[in-house]
Amino acid sequence: MDGSPPHPAAHRDPGPGPGRRDLLRLGTLLAAGGLAAAVPAALARADTATGGGGEVTTTYRGHSPYGFDQWASVGFDVPDGVRRISVAAAFDPADGVLDLGMFGPTGFRGWSGGARREFTLSGSDATPGYVPGPIGAGRWSVALGPIVNDPAGMPWQISVTLHHGPPLPEVPYDVLPGAVPGRGPGWYRGDLHLHTVHSDGGRTTDQLVAAARAAGMHFIATSDHNTSSTGLSWRGNVPADLLVLNAEEVTTRHGHWLAVGLPQGEWVDWHYGPADAGVFDRHVRQVRGLGGLAVAAHPMTPAPGSFWEFGLDRVDALEIWNGPWTLDDAANIAVWHGMLCLGQRIAGLGNSDAHGPADAVGEPHNVVHAAGLSRPEILDALRRGRSYAAENTGVTVDFTAAAHGATAGPGEELPLALFEAVDVTAEVSGAPDAVITLHTEWGVMAVARTGGDGRGRLHWRGWGRGSLFARAEVRRLKPASTTLDQLVAVTNPIWFHAAGLAPYDAGQRTLVAAVRAADGSWGRHTALPGVQGTPAVAGVGASVAGLPDGTVLTLGLGTDGGLWLTTRKPEGAPGPWRRLSGPHGRDGGAFLDAAIAGFPDGSGEIVAVAADGTLHHQRVTAAGTASGRFRPVPGDASAGGRAGGRRGAVRAAVAALPDGSAQVVAYGTDGALHHRIRRTDGTWTGWTRLTGRAGAPAFSGQALAIAGLLDGSAQVLAVGLDGTVHHRVRRPDGTWTGFRPLPGAAAPAVAAGSVGIAGLPDGSAQVAAVGRDGTARHCTRRPDGSWTAWARIPGPDGRGAFRAGRIAVAPLPDGTLHLAAVATG
């Protein structure tokens, strides 16, 4: 007898199946990376005791200093005849955590992190997380990852027991099938981030398979922390109806990432950080070379070691939704969206990160369109973004874009000509009482609601290359643990340009200003100077307001969602930009849309849609400083009100009236256009849903603007979901005209992606619009209600065309018209 703990497999005939001896030989190539960063631990002393049955125990006592990012090892020699190694650790949890692992002469032999304080391994069995196999003579090391929160450090003790005896038989493992037979092209559901007892999970592999079947998954990936042992544990229990992908969650001290689709037994090292030049990229190449996928896991989680520090553009995909929806996931999506706006094609994934039996597998999961239910086909589809993430298997999203007789879905290209229309549709089921939103790099373009039956449809028409991509989200307007809403589904984008053709540079989307003189002539465009000396400021939105003394307030919405304000006094240059605090006074708050209007008393009013979809407002002084902070605009049930009486919106505009009141129009989360008045005493009227064209109960659209005139009327411009521009007047007595389309230059209606309107002292309304060809045009509504013809706004050099993505205009008392726009080159 060798004194080893008994194991039921100790006397089994190994039978057919892959052995581990050849596999472990490969570890010599990996050991150099795994132990290179682990310095020998500072040992106080080592005591050895001999027990019965051929056991020899050596106890090593050491001390680790305060710190998080440190690795150490305890080395020991193993003579011939040892058949089992057992390790036990002791430390005070009040001092920190001691992660554990093992390396042998042939390389990696296991990792349990902080999930266990003891483990054992032999040729026939091993504690989950550790690789069974021959106990070869030579130098072995217990790998340590001390996380010490006590400034005085953490003392610890490692006991290594060597069990001598006759050789133990090796136990073979089963090879996971690479495909589920008989499954061709279609949509498949799968969860790529799952843990078992081989790391810190509470399920065995058999229990995980049962949970995946119960959740309706077609494929899963077992992704335990820093170990390859999960893939070597399949013995007679390989499922035939579920595709199991072998994976590892590579858990560094600088971010976690999923190596998905690894061959069984393959191990990826984790002992490195961003300062180790080229190491991370080498391991990503290793995974890709094996046909796998590198995914940044929960990258914006602010916990130590979880927050991503390696650069998000160096992986194949981002886990933008990890487990139950939280504020961390909202940050993931915001960062991912910013990358998409730069033309970076990186897939977004959703996984449950389920650990214990109480964690639901597949909530959320990925719905993937693949050529078949096989490892290479699923991974290829995921890499290309041919997927969307859903909170459960009851949710489906049919997201498509159609143009020139072709149709594309998530992850596909639909290259457009400059003047070409594109129709984007999202059909949703299984999501009762939710909101569907369509996003491009210009923000939320359209919104629709689902009914109590869970079904809903959104349609939007865009023009030409006005957008790089489109993607859809479905949200439930009910609070979660840390958010005011809950994500139900999110799609990867459909791209409107070919991968081999560079999209227009997002850095060229600069904020510019121009002036139209009272005689109708246009001055040259001026790029607004950037922040901290940069030559220009990049943005995705712009608004402008004129004050009675000739001051111009310009509002810019940055590519990061920041809201910036600058002031230009008469005959002066624009002043420095000031970033406005976010909702509730937080610094660095992000917004989706914003507009500003100027009042007769010299103040301005800003309305802004926060990142969580709530509408806020704030007063600013003529000097461009905030007179308070953003406060929620009250909501009500008829206008898609949010929890706590807040108003939900996706786009908003504001107009100042001569009596000092303000009128606000907004596309609500119900997909309809609403109107509200803030009285001069600061109180609000209720929201009114505006009827649509030709008696339709509502008007839905993608862009809007409002202007107040001296007679107390207000004029509204709204771009419908079909891309055409409509006009409506609210008379001084509060009654409305109906919506009418604006006539085009050579068509009964004009199409546009952005509009601005301003009322001049002579009673006219000046209109600017970005047409479907991406160029800006101008026309005038005369006081008698007739319209002038459209004319191009000249380009920056005073000639040619002015290309823009967003546009706004504001009047001054001298009859000039001031324009603010996001130029696209």
Give a label for each model feature:
Residues 98-154, 453-459, 594, 704, ...:
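Noncatalytic accessory or regulatory domains flanking protease catalytic cores in secreted, cell-surface
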